[in-house]
């Protein structure tokens, strides 16, 4: 038991010799310091030769200084803006050369005219007279179409009475036509009344020609209808129904067949119609001047009718 106690004491002394005293942290506030109980250290017994010497601690390596930092690269200054070049002035517009005036056209009348001979002067006068006559005829023709129709009907009524025609107008209608005819004749100049009378006579002749053509066409249509009826009676009933459209074709042609007269004769007085023209002219000269109390030159009864003047229906 003693040996055991001795060994325990040796062990404790060895451990206490090695233990390093730890410094106690003192509190910041002195008021908070509390007294600590001091534990009495056990007296270390020194045993010769038993303490081991620890090797001296090597000093910590000193930290190597950091390499000196390289200075930052100096920022290069921005390039200074170059001054703008002075702007060149705009090029002045080139002055155009003055335009040359257009060459003036020389009027034709400035050219020296050749002297006109007497024959040429007469021809020009004749041409002017013909043109004036044509213009007068056209004007009178228009007057006839619009104004002298009542005179035509009045003279035509007298002609029908003289020839005992069935186309006789009523008394009231005849009086109205007389008034209208006289009003139109008074508006026509005296020098043109003879031409107006001739136009009235011409219109009457054209009207009679048209009536004759209509009568001829009606007679032809009646004859064709009679021939068709006779053919239908002679043919059997079976053939009639088959050939009936063919038999109707000539009847349609009847209304378009031209008369046997010369086509150029239509619209103008022909030489063979001069006796008829003279008869109607005398009747018009007896009726119209006395009825309307207008003056008509005496040469109007002897002049020849103008050919080629168209009348109205």
Swiss-Prot record:
<feature type="region of interest" description="Disordered">
    <location>
        <begin position="234"/>
        <end position="272"/>
    </location>
</feature>
<feature type="compositionally biased region" description="Low complexity">
    <location>
        <begin position="234"/>
        <end position="264"/>
    </location>
</feature>
<comment type="similarity">
    <text>Belongs to the gliadin/glutenin family.</text>
</comment>
<keyword id="KW-0020">Allergen</keyword>
<keyword id="KW-0677">Repeat</keyword>
<feature type="compositionally biased region" description="Low complexity">
    <location>
        <begin position="102"/>
        <end position="122"/>
    </location>
</feature>
<feature type="compositionally biased region" description="Pro residues">
    <location>
        <begin position="78"/>
        <end position="101"/>
    </location>
</feature>
<keyword id="KW-0708">Seed storage protein</keyword>
<dbReference type="InterPro" id="IPR036312">
    <property type="entry name" value="Bifun_inhib/LTP/seed_sf"/>
</dbReference>
<keyword id="KW-0732">Signal</keyword>
<protein>
    <recommendedName>
        <fullName>Alpha/beta-gliadin clone PW8142</fullName>
    </recommendedName>
</protein>
<keyword id="KW-0758">Storage protein</keyword>
<feature type="region of interest" description="Disordered">
    <location>
        <begin position="22"/>
        <end position="122"/>
    </location>
</feature>
<feature type="compositionally biased region" description="Pro residues">
    <location>
        <begin position="56"/>
        <end position="68"/>
    </location>
</feature>
<comment type="function">
    <text>Gliadin is the major seed storage protein in wheat.</text>
</comment>
<feature type="compositionally biased region" description="Low complexity">
    <location>
        <begin position="22"/>
        <end position="55"/>
    </location>
</feature>
<dbReference type="InterPro" id="IPR001954">
    <property type="entry name" value="Glia_glutenin"/>
</dbReference>
<feature type="signal peptide">
    <location>
        <begin position="1"/>
        <end position="20"/>
    </location>
</feature>
<dbReference type="GO" id="GO:0045735">
    <property type="term" value="F:nutrient reservoir activity"/>
</dbReference>
<dbReference type="InterPro" id="IPR016140">
    <property type="entry name" value="Bifunc_inhib/LTP/seed_store"/>
</dbReference>
């Amino acid at each position: 038991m003693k040996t055991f106690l001795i060994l325990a004491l040796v062990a404790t002394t060895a451990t206490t010799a090695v233990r390093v005293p730890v410094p106690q942290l003192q509190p910041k506030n002195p008021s908070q310091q509390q007294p600590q109980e001091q534990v009495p250290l056990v007296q270390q017994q020194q045993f010769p030769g038993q303490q081991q010497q620890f090797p001296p601690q090597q000093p910590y390596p000193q930290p190597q200084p950091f390499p000196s930092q390289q200075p930052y690269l100096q920022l290069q200054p921005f390039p200074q803006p170059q001054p703008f070049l002075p702007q060149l002035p705009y090029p002045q517009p080139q002055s155009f050369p003055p335009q040359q005036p257009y060459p003036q056209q020389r009027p034709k009348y400035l050219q020296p005219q050749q002297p006109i001979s007497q024959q040429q002067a007469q021809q020009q006068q004749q041409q002017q007279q013909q043109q004036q006559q044509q213009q007068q005829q056209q004007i009178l023709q228009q007057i006839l179409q619009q104004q002298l129709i009542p005179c035509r009907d009045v003279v035509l009524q007298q002609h029908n009475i003289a020839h005992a025609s069935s186309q006789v107008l009523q008394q009231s209608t005849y009086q109205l036509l007389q008034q209208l005819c006289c009003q139109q004749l008074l508006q026509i100049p005296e020098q043109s009344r003879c031409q107006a009378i001739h136009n009235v006579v011409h219109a009457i002749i054209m009207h009679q020609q048209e009536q004759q053509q209509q009568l001829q066409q009606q007679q032809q249509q009646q004859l064709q209808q009679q021939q068709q009826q006779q053919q239908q009676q002679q043919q059997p009933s079976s053939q009639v129904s088959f050939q009936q459209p063919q038999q109707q074709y000539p009847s349609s042609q009847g209304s378009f067949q031209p008369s046997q007269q010369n086509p150029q004769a239509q619209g103008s007085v022909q030489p063979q119609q001069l006796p008829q023209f003279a008869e109607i002219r005398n009747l018009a000269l007896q009726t119209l001047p006395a009825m309307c109390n207008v003056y008509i030159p005496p040469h109007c009864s002897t002049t020849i009718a103008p050919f080629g003047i168209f009348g109205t229906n």
